[in-house]
C-alpha cells in the first residue's frame, strides 16, 4: 500500500473531485484526473504514526473524493470494510474510461456502443499478464483488460442478486474473473449481464437478429464482429487459454473455447445458456466455433442446440440383401394376379348359348340364370346333327385362333390356380386350428394343478394345531396369557392333544412334565406363530367357579416351580365343553 507522506501529497481534481496521493519520495503516481487505489494486503489494522493529524486529514480527503466518484456506494462506519472493495472499482474505472475514448474512433470496428443498450461491456482481464495467478491486484494498475459484449446470457434484472460489497478480483484469484460488472456484482453470478429487457426466450429481441441492421433496418448479411463469442470455462483450465485477441479475431490453428449448454454445469439454474443463441453461433459462424482444447472437459454427445441446423438429409436406404431382394411369395402371388386371365376357347355349346341367350331371355319372363341355362340346354339337345355341326365348326376355328394368340397357353394354368388357391385355403385353416388348439392347451396346462388328497398324519403330536379343525385344537385365549406373564403359553404338543388325553388332567400334566425340556426350547417360536395365525376360541377368561377341583389343585408329585409354569397352560388349553364337566 502506498504510504502517505508528511505533507499534502495531492489535490482534488476539478469537477470529478479525484484525489492524488504521493509516496514518501514525493513522486506523482499519475495525472490529476486519475484515482489512486488504496489496497490492504493482509487485512492488518493500520498502526497510528506520530504525524497522525496530517496523514488522517489526507486520508479523509481521499476517501471522500473516492466516495463521491463511486456510484450507488453507501458509506460504512468500518473503514476497513469500506476500503477493501474500493480497488476493484478503481481498477475497472480506468480501463472503462480508456476504452470509452478508444471506442469513439472505432465505432465501425469490433466495439459498438449504442447497438446493445441492454448488455453492458464486460471486463475481460488480459490472460497473458503475469499477474493472473494467485495473488493481489497488479501493482500500479498495470493490469490490462479487454472489453466484450455478452448477449449470450439473458437474465432479467429482477432475478439477479446484487451485492454492494462484492470482493475484489484479488479475493477471487482462485476463480476465473471472466466477467466483472463495473460497479456491483454478486460473486456467484460472474457470467450474467444485467438487462432490464424482459422478453421470453421464444421471441428473441430485435438486437439479436443478425439479418437486420439495428440502425437502418435494411436486411444485410451478418458481420462476424457483431456477434461476441461466449466463454464458459472451468477454473482448472486458466493456464491453457491463449491471448484473448484470439477469441475476437480467430486465426488458423488457434483453438477456441466453446462448450455446449449441456456441458456447462453450473449449480445455479439461472445461468443456463439460451439454446437458440448458441445454435445461432454454431450455425451462422462456424469458423468461430472450433473444437475445444484437449485439456478442457467436453461432452461426448453434442447438444442438439449446438448442431448446425442445416437441411436434414434422410439416410440413404440400405442396399437390399440377396435374401430380401429375392421375390417373396406374396409378391409372386400379386404378379400372378396382375396377369390377364386367359379364358379357354369356347366350345360348340357355349357358342350356341352365346348366340341364343338373348332370344330366350326375350321370350321368357324368367330372369334366373340357372333356368335360362336349362332352357338353352334342352334346345341344344333338340337340334339336329347338321345344326350342331355348324357350331362345332365355329368352335374349331375359335380354338385355332386362341392357339395363334396364346401359343404357350394350357388349360392346366387356370385349373392349377384354382387347385392352388384351394390348397392354400385348407393349409391356412389347418394352421389356424392348430394354433388355437395349442393356445388352449397351454392355458389349460397353466390353469390346472395336480390334485393331491390331503391326509392328516397319524401321530397327533406331529400334526399342526389347525389340522383337525376341531374346537379341541384352538389355542389359549390371549387374555389368560396376559394375566400371568411368567407362565409360558400353551405349546404345540399341548394344544394338539386328542380327546382321550385332554379329558384326563393328570395324564396331561405327566405328559407336560416329561416333555418340559423339549417344550421350553420351542415355546417362544410356537407362541409367536400360533397366537398371530389362529383366532382364540374363548373371548374372555373362564371364571374360577366353573373350573373343576381336580384342575385347580395340582398333584402332590409336582414341584412348586412346575406348578407355577404349567398350571395356567393346562387351564388355557381346555375347551369350553370339557371345562364345564366335572372330573371323575
From Swiss-Prot:
Compositionally skewed regions (Gly residues) per UniProt: 1-28
Motif (Nuclear localization signal): 417-423
DNA-binding positions: 342-410
SMART domains named in the record: HMG
Pfam families reported for this sequence: CTNNB1_binding, HMG_box
Biased composition (Low complexity): 64-78, 427-437, 470-491
Tissues expressing this chain: Detected in the basal layer of epidermis and in outer root sheath and bulge of hair follicles.
MF terms in GO: beta-catenin binding; chromatin binding; DNA binding; DNA-binding transcription factor activity
Description of its domains: The putative Groucho interaction domain between the N-terminal CTNNB1 binding domain and the HMG-box is necessary for repression of the transactivation mediated by TCF7L1 and CTNNB1.
Protein name: Transcription factor 7-like 1
Species this protein is from: Mus musculus
Organism ancestry: Eukaryota, Metazoa, Chordata, Craniata, Vertebrata
Amino acid at each position: 500500500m502506498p504510504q502517505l507522506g508528511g505533507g499534502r501529497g495531492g489535490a482534488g481534481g476539478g469537477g470529478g473531485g479525484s484525489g492524488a496521493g504521493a509516496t514518501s519520495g514525493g513522486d506523482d503516481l499519475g495525472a490529476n484526473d486519475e484515482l489512486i487505489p488504496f489496497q490492504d494486503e493482509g487485512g492488518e489494522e493500520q498502526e497510528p504514526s506520530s504525524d497522525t493529524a496530517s496523514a488522517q486529514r489526507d486520508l479523509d480527503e481521499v476517501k471522500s473524493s473516492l466516495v463521491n466518484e463511486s456510484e450507488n456506494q453507501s458509506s460504512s462506519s468500518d473503514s476497513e470494510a469500506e476500503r477493501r472493495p474500493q480497488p476493484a472499482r478503481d481498477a475497472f474505472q480506468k480501463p472503462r474510461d480508456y476504452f470509452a475514448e478508444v471506442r469513439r474512433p472505432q465505432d465501425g470496428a469490433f466495439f459498438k456502443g449504442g447497438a446493445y443498450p441492454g448488455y453492458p461491456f464486460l471486463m475481460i482481464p488480459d490472460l497473458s499478464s503475469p499477474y493472473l495467478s494467485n495473488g493481489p491486484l497488479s501493482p500500479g494498475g498495470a493490469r490490462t483488460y479487454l472489453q466484450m459484449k455478452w448477449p449470450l446470457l439473458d437474465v432479467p434484472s429482477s432475478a439477479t442478486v446484487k451485492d454492494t460489497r462484492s470482493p475484489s478480483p484479488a479475493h477471487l484469484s482462485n476463480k476465473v474473473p471472466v466477467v466483472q460488472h463495473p460497479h456491483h456484482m454478486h460473486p456467484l453470478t460472474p457470467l450474467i449481464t444485467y438487462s432490464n429487457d424482459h422478453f421470453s426466450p421464444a421471441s428473441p429481441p430485435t438486437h439479436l437478429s443478425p439479418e437486420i441492421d439495428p440502425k437502418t433496418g435494411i436486411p444485410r448479411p451478418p458481420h462476424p464482429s457483431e456477434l461476441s463469442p461466449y466463454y464458459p470455462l472451468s477454473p482448472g483450465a486458466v493456464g491453457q487459454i491463449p491471448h484473448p485477441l484470439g477469441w475476437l479475431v480467430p486465426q488458423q490453428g488457434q483453438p477456441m473455447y466453446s462448450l455446449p449448454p449441456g456441458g456447462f454445469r453450473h449449480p445455479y439454474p439461472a445461468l443456463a445458456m439460451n439454446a437458440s443463441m448458441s445454435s445461432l453461433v454454431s450455425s451462422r459462424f462456424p469458423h468461430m466455433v472450433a473444437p475445444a482444447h484437449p485439456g478442457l472437459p467436453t461432452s461426448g454427445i453434442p447438444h442438439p442446440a449446438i448442431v448446425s441446423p442445416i437441411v436434414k438429409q434422410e439416410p440413404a436406404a440400405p442396399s437390399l440383401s440377396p435374401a430380401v431382394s429375392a421375390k417373396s411369395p406374396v409378391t409372386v402371388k400379386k404378379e400372378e394376379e396382375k396377369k390377364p386371365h386367359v379364358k379357354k376357347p369356347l366350345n360348340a355349346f357355349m357358342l350356341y348359348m352365346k348366340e341364343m341367350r338373348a332370344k330366350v331371355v326375350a321370350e321368357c319372363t324368367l330372369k334366373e340364370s340357372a333356368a335360362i341355362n336349362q332352357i338353352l340346354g334342352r334346345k341344344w339337345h333338340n337340334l339336329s346333327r347338321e345344326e350342331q355341326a355348324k357350331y362345332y365348326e365355329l368352335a374349331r376355328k375359335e380354338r385355332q385362333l386362341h392357339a395363334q394368340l396364346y401359343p404357350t397357353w394350357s388349360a392346366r394354368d387356370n385349373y392349377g390356380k384354382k387347385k392352388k388357391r384351394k390348397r392354400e385355403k385348407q393349409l391356412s385353416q389347418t394352421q389356424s386350428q392348430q394354433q388355437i388348439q395349442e393356445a388352449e392347451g397351454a392355458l389349460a396346462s397353466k390353469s390346472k394343478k395336480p390334485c393331491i388328497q390331503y391326509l392328516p398324519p397319524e401321530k397327533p403330536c406331529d400334526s399342526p394345531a389347525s389340522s383337525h379343525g376341531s374346537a379341541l385344537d384352538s389355542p389359549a385365549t390371549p387374555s389368560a396369557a396376559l394375566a400371568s406373564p411368567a407362565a409360558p403359553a400353551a405349546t404345540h404338543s399341548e394344544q394338539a392333544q386328542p380327546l382321550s388325553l385332554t379329558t384326563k388332567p393328570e395324564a396331561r400334566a405327566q405328559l407336560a412334565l416329561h416333555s418340559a425340556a423339549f417344550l421350553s426350547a420351542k415355546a417362544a417360536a410356537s407362541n409367536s406363530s400360533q397366537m398371530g395365525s389362529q383366532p382364540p376360541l374363548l373371548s374372555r377368561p373362564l371364571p374360577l367357579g366353573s373350573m373343576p377341583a381336580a384342575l385347580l389343585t395340582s398333584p402332590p408329585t409336582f414341584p412348586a416351580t412346575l406348578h407355577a409354569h404349567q398350571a395356567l397352560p393346562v387351564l388355557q388349553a381346555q375347551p369350553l365343553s370339557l371345562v364345564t364337566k366335572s372330573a371323575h
